């Protein structure tokens, strides 16, 4: 496990939860995750859940993605998706508003790996360098990804070579995120 990335993710999650507490006097609330089982759920309302991050309990790797492509995935990606269970968190990096993706449960972790595999299949078919997404943007065809060759974080337009460098590594990126509520 990449300790710098794990700590940066935990630190951002704490900043996010602290901001939520400050603004709403509660743990983060999600309507989107209502009815979806997770160890993160601490209480349920009529149409939403309150959540708090929990330690990841499964195998701490995305080996299914590695096996599917017979490639080695950046250690930071293993760490990013296996440090904790949490809800997705809205954030800002510079002037970019994003949703930082998280694994919600062990079932969700399997789905995330399947989506990463699908993303890599498309990139391979289009002969694009491999990236692994970590966040979504309002623009549907743009994501924040980690380049699997260099470990750099970039804003990527899906299906194209258009990439904008954002940070030299995932820990640096996470450390610069500001929570958005």
UniProtKB/Swiss-Prot annotation:
| Cellular component terms per the entry's GO annotation | cytoplasmic side of plasma membrane
Cellular compartment(s): Cell inner membrane
Tell me the membrane topology, using the record's own terms: Peripheral membrane protein
Keywords noted in UniProt:
Cell inner membrane, Cell membrane, Membrane
Q: Which InterPro entries match?
A: Syd, Syd_sf
Q: Could you say which protein family the record assigns here?
A: Belongs to the Syd family.
State what this protein does: Interacts with the SecY protein in vivo. May bind preferentially to an uncomplexed state of SecY, thus functioning either as a chelating agent for excess SecY in the cell or as a regulatory factor that negatively controls the translocase function.
Name of the protein in its database record:
Protein Syd
Q: Could you tell me which species this protein originates from?
A: Escherichia coli O81 (strain ED1a)
